[in-house]
């Protein structure tokens, strides 16, 4: 299955985070790293973003139930 690359507006829509929050979390190694698409364009692997979202859900449920 081919990997899909998400651009920043899609990542913002998927995560609900702002641009600055995404880059701050990346700097703190709390968010998937972007990949270079050439020039100044970057993107994120859809699978990595989906895993990050799943991890947040799991952490929230573990914290609130445990």
What are these regions (language model features)?
Residues 1-27, 48, 54-57:
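Polyanion-binding surface elements
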Residues 4, 30, 40:
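Residue-level signal for beta-strand positions within conserved beta-sheet cores that form or flank
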Residues 16-19, 32, 62:
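Intrinsically disordered, low-complexity segments
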Residues 28-34:
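Short, solvent-exposed alpha-helical "recognition" segments
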Residues 35-41:
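Short Lys/Arg-enriched helix C-cap and helix-to-coil transition segments
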Residues 60-66:
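Short, charged recognition helix plus adjacent turn
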């Amino acid at each position: 299955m081919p990997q899909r690359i998400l651009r920043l507006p899609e990542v913002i829509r998927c995560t609900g985070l702002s641009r600055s929050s995404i880059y701050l979390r990346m700097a703190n190694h709390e968010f998937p790293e972007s990949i270079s698409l050439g020039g100044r364009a970057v993107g994120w692997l859809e699978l990595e973003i989906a895993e990050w979202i799943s991890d947040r859900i799991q952490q929230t449920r573990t914290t609130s139930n445990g």
